[in-house]
């Protein structure tokens, strides 16, 4: 998917999973005047519905190019999202959840960084937010800040003074605030899929942590959730 590019426009690479948060981030970057290049990953996750959702969102929000990178993270295992022998939990537990994928955001941001350097983009957007902090170590502000420092040490562009910024505009927002922001920016949340185990038609289980957080966010925002359930 490639749209017409205004060559004078600043460029951004945006991690797009196909879920609520990343779709909102694409809309935010677009509203800030960026030419948006989105990157998704087929990494061996349980549900491929999110990849179809990412393509729909990219098309609807008019990104310049949408790229899907294939990775075999399920070959390593270690997560309920990539290993079907590990059950998706239906209750919140203590500590880091089994839905944590080892080093996932580090890997994803590294590949986004490579594409950004090729494109001459200086901004990389990711949809991590306050809801994720307690459970996922690679969603914390300290991680984002550290990755940005690394990006500017480890790249030709960074060494030559054309530094990168890792932008996490949802970092201090609740799920309700994210939904409200997206609605104002015209995000069609009916195109998105948040469920960890959505079926091939994108219908959600309504039981996993991601489904519950999404439903609670829409309810708190006072906005109808367009999620379909199986």
Swiss-Prot record:
<feature type="binding site">
    <location>
        <position position="208"/>
    </location>
    <ligand>
        <name>Zn(2+)</name>
    </ligand>
</feature>
<comment type="similarity">
    <text>Belongs to the QueC family.</text>
</comment>
<keyword id="KW-0862">Zinc</keyword>
<keyword id="KW-0436">Ligase</keyword>
<feature type="binding site">
    <location>
        <position position="195"/>
    </location>
    <ligand>
        <name>Zn(2+)</name>
    </ligand>
</feature>
<keyword id="KW-0479">Metal-binding</keyword>
<dbReference type="GO" id="GO:0016879">
    <property type="term" value="F:ligase activity, forming carbon-nitrogen bonds"/>
</dbReference>
<dbReference type="GO" id="GO:0005524">
    <property type="term" value="F:ATP binding"/>
</dbReference>
<comment type="pathway">
    <text>Purine metabolism; 7-cyano-7-deazaguanine biosynthesis.</text>
</comment>
<comment type="function">
    <text>Catalyzes the ATP-dependent conversion of 7-carboxy-7-deazaguanine (CDG) to 7-cyano-7-deazaguanine (preQ(0)).</text>
</comment>
<dbReference type="GO" id="GO:0008616">
    <property type="term" value="P:queuosine biosynthetic process"/>
</dbReference>
<keyword id="KW-0671">Queuosine biosynthesis</keyword>
<feature type="binding site">
    <location>
        <position position="205"/>
    </location>
    <ligand>
        <name>Zn(2+)</name>
    </ligand>
</feature>
<keyword id="KW-0547">Nucleotide-binding</keyword>
<dbReference type="InterPro" id="IPR014729">
    <property type="entry name" value="Rossmann-like_a/b/a_fold"/>
</dbReference>
<keyword id="KW-0067">ATP-binding</keyword>
<feature type="binding site">
    <location>
        <begin position="16"/>
        <end position="26"/>
    </location>
    <ligand>
        <name>ATP</name>
    </ligand>
</feature>
<feature type="binding site">
    <location>
        <position position="211"/>
    </location>
    <ligand>
        <name>Zn(2+)</name>
    </ligand>
</feature>
<dbReference type="InterPro" id="IPR018317">
    <property type="entry name" value="QueC"/>
</dbReference>
<dbReference type="GO" id="GO:0008270">
    <property type="term" value="F:zinc ion binding"/>
</dbReference>
<dbReference type="Pfam" id="PF06508">
    <property type="entry name" value="QueC"/>
</dbReference>
<protein>
    <recommendedName>
        <fullName>7-cyano-7-deazaguanine synthase</fullName>
        <ecNumber>6.3.4.20</ecNumber>
    </recommendedName>
</protein>
